[in-house]
A protein has these predicted regions:
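Extended Lys/Arg-rich polyanion-binding regions
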Residues: 358-360, 366-384, 391, 401-413, ...
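Intrinsically disordered, low-complexity segments enriched in proline/serine/threonine
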Residues: 12, 25-27, 49, 206, ...
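Short cysteine clusters
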Residues: 711-720
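Helicase motor core with emphasis on the C-terminal RecA-like subdomain
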Residues: 1-25, 35-95, 99, 103-410, ...
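ASCE P-loop NTPase motor cores of helicases and related translocases
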Residues: 12, 243-244, 705, 723-724, ...
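Acidic, low-complexity intrinsically disordered tails
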Residues: 33, 213-221, 227, 546-562, ...
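Flexible loop/turn segments at secondary-structure boundaries
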Residues: 3, 128, 163-166, 265-266, ...
Length: 752
């Protein structure tokens, strides 16, 4: 799109002029202040280390006099860091290092900060949800620290997929919208990209899988639910992606495949290599996997091989989604909808960057949202990319950020507006909790520990776990804390560059997961249980039963209903508020790597994890369900199926994917006393997703109903009401009941 050139021209020009002794002026648009010396330093911030490394390669290739560019991230050797602080004038870093190293140790960076003229935020659209809220506060902290050194840098936000650049960027850096100028003309030289939407075929009958891998034991069959056994299943996007990538590599088409998880990436790469070995020996080594958790050396080597053409096919997570400049890619496969139109366009844009025509294929996963999208291409191409949703005032985000800001410099009363309207109340609470100390001139951090350690920017729940080979003690890789319980539990299969391991043990205290090398023919998926408790109700909307509904027990005309509900809730009520979610991994399932066949389930209880977050929930009078045609027997399955489908379709109207959400349904909830469906944000403090559903409920539920009605299955399948995350093995489920209930809910809302 030409966005890189738009910030490189002014920043490199300033660096060159400063190196020649010429006067440099970079007046800030939002304050009128300017730097007081003639240095020209640039701080480039990207959400991924791979993107920073790519930009550094491009910068050094310019051989510009006076340019001293360097990466400063977790992979930077300790011996090089002091030189970078004292001599580099174009530093490429990540939000993590800005928090843990630069701002918290800003006195060591005084020389660089005094000459800081430009801050570049690459891929600015990626700062959404809780991550975006952290980045917004991090940038406010950066502006505070810059003010200590009497510098007011110009901020550049670069994004090729932003629907509201002025609004989102002004909110991100904390300035008025009138201070932001949008440059929206694309100047890139691109060929034509053909985009195909591919819905895989249904798999052969279950007997085919059993013949292929041998019959399972009766006990194993019994563990899998009846619904899952009988439901038709499509070929998985991983299997379909491996088949397509094999064909592309055989035709020497340089290709990139995006998959949704680390395990999927490894399996896809493994399958492709096996298929290639069956057809043309010697090609399998030109296919690899790329994801977080590899060592820095492994990542850099893979990036090098992809650029120079040694690799013909690469399976990647979102780690390669961002604007890494890889010329010569001819095809991109997207194995499963990535969650947002912005993310999809980013992935499609990886191909054809050298001006040649390109191919992009979305391979639909077997779930309601993917099914909806392949049959409604206008939902992808007929509208702008999603708004970037984040809330800088989220108290779970802002509280640790305020502690870090107070350590960098005491927070003065006149600065409170910088962090939002709830800052004073949060500061008082932090004083009461002993984190801060209030003095006449402001709020102080008085502890010996670094306050920056309280800030969990990526919501990973603490530092990463080291994956250690139990046989020789070598470091295999790392795993973030957010995935440790579900992917690092004993018995889990872990794949690293086609080498397979089984987890022997997990130590929370030592942050170590011990692995043993194995050669299994299955992969694992965790089984989880969930409990939701209501803490605070922030809003509610009440609806009556649909006109003409047959409500058992409803009073006759002229009679009044007895007041039996303590809360006086309506027949249908939609709520929004704060909830506490307790998740626990209780075991895991095994699936065949060949056809995805279910092989059995093992118990493996892990410590529970507690999440305080935001949710939307629906409560029903029992008579409302009867009036909608839902029998008492179908009640649990109706609520369960409606919950699954609603979670699957909410990402259609909010910047998220279904893995950013969780849910629970019950015929009698302990806090509401009635049938209840919960949909909650799977992030501490919330991410604004459920609130978007609350505010656009008719659009949300209409899409959910359409997805169910348009699915050709009889009793429910992954394309409509099954969920890959379900801890109850997708049982009970009533597709017909969910359809009837959603029809009644939409009628109630239309009549309100």
């Amino acid at each position: 799109s030409g966005k890189t050139l738009s910030y490189l021209m002014p920043t490199l020009d300033a660096i060159y002029r400063a190196s020649c002794g010429e006067p440099v002026s970079s007046t800030s648009a939002y304050s009128g202040a300017e730097n007081l010396n003639n240095r020209a330093n640039v701080l480039y911030i990207s959400p991924a280390k791979a993107l920073s490394a790519d930009q550094l390669t491009a910068l050094t290739s310019y051989n510009l006099p006076g340019l001293h560019a360097a990466s400063y991230d977790g992979d930077t050797p300790t011996g090089e860091r002091r030189w970078i602080r004292e001599h580099a004038n174009f530093i490429l870093t990540t939000p993590d290092m800005l928090n843990y190293s630069i701002l918290s140790n800003h006195r060591q960076w005084a020389s660089f900060l005094r000459g800081l003229r430009y801050v570049v935020l690459d891929e600015a659209h990626s700062y959404r949800g809780v991550f975006g809220a952290h980045i917004a506060n991090l940038l406010r902290r950066l502006r505070r620290v810059c003010a200590l050194y009497r510098t007011v840098p110009v901020f550049y936000g670069a994004s090729a997929t932003s629907s509201n650049p002025v609004e989102s960027f002004s909110k991100l850096i904390g300035v008025p919208q009138q201070a932001v100028t949008a440059i929206t003309e694309s100047t890139s030289a691109r060929g034509e990209t053909t985009v195909a939407l591919w819905e895989p075929e249904f798999m052969p009958p279950k007997a085919h899988d059993q013949l292929a891998k041998g019959a399972r034991s009766t006990q194993q069959q019994a563990v899998q639910s009846k619904a899952e056994q009988e439901a038709p299943r499509r070929v998985s996007p991983v299997e379909q992606g491996a088949q397509m990538l094999t064909d592309l590599v055989l035709s020497r088409t340089r290709s990139l495949v995006f998959a949704g998880s680390r395990r999927s990436v490894e399996i896809l790469s493994q399958k492709t290599q096996r298929y290639l070995d069956e057809v043309e020996a010697g090609l399998s080594h030109r296919v690899a996997a790329y994801r977080a958790g590899y060592t820095p050396e492994e990542r850099r080597e893979l990036e090098r091989k992809l650029r120079n053409g040694e690799l013909l096919g690469l399976a990647s997570t979102s780690a390669l989604e961002l604007g890494i400049d890889i010329s010569g890619l001819d095809a991109v496969l997207v194995a499963g909808w990535p969650g947002t139109r912005a993310s999809f366009m980013q992935r499609v844009g990886r191909a054809g960057r050298s001006g040649q025509d390109a191919l992009a294929v979305l391979i639909a996963d077997d779930n309601p949202l993917d099914t909806y999208l392949v049959h409604h291409p206008e939902a992808i191409f007929g509208q702008e990319v999603e708004a970037t949703v984040f809330d800088p005032t989220n108290p779970y985000v802002l509280s640790p950020q305020l502690c870090a800001a107070a350590q960098e410099a005491p927070i003065r009363a006149e600065e409170l507006s910088l962090f939002g309207p709830h800052t004073a109340a949060l500061l008082d609470r932090l004083v009461q909790q002993g984190y801060l100390r209030r003095r006449p001139d402001g709020w102080y951090w008085t502890h010996a520990e670094s306050a920056a350690d309280l800030v969990d920017i990526r919501g990973t729940g603490g530092g990463p776990y080291q994956l250690i080979d139990a046989e020789d003690g070598t470091l295999v890789g790392t795993m973030d804390a957010a995935h440790a319980m579900s992917q690092g539990h004993p018995g889990a299969i872990y794949i690293h560059q086609n080498a397979q391991y089984v987890v022997e043990s997990l130590s929370e205290g030592e942050r170590v997961i011990l692995l043993s090398r194995v050669y299994p023919d299955y992969y694992t998926r965790a089984v989880e249980s969930t409990e939701v408790r209501i803490l605070v109700e922030r809003a509610r909307v009440s609806y009556s039963a649909p006109a003409g509904a047959a409500i058992p027990g409803e009073p006759a005309p002229g009679e009044s209903a007895p007041e039996t509900d303590a809360q006086q809730l309506a027949p249908l009520t939609m709520h929004r508020g704060q909830v506490q979610v307790t998740d626990q991994v209780t075991g895991y399932r095994r699936f065949s790597v060949y056809g995805g066949e279910y092989l059995g389930e093992e118990e493996q209880p892990m410590p529970p994890e507690v999440l305080m977050t935001e949710a939307v929930w629906f409560t029903f009078e029992p008579s409302y369900l009867f009036g909608a045609g839902v029998t008492e027997e179908d009640g649990p399955g109706t609520l369960h199926a409606a919950e699954h489908a609603a979670i699957g379709l909410l990402p259609l109207i909010a910047t998220s994917d279904r893995w950013d959400l969780g849910g629970l349904s019950t015929l009698l909830h302990v806090d509401t006393g009635r049938p209840t469906i919960f949909v909650y944000d799977a992030a501490p403090g919330g991410a604004g997703i459920s609130e978007r559903g609350f505010n656009a409920v008719a659009q949300w539920l209409s899409a959910t109903l359409e997805a169910i009605e348009s699915c050709g299955c009889e009793n429910g399948c992954p394309s409509c009401v099954h969920s890959p995350k379900c801890g109850n093995r997708n049982e009970p489920l009533s597709k017909h009941g969910a359809r009837a209930l959603l029809q009644a809910m939409l009628q109630s809302m239309a009549e309100a």
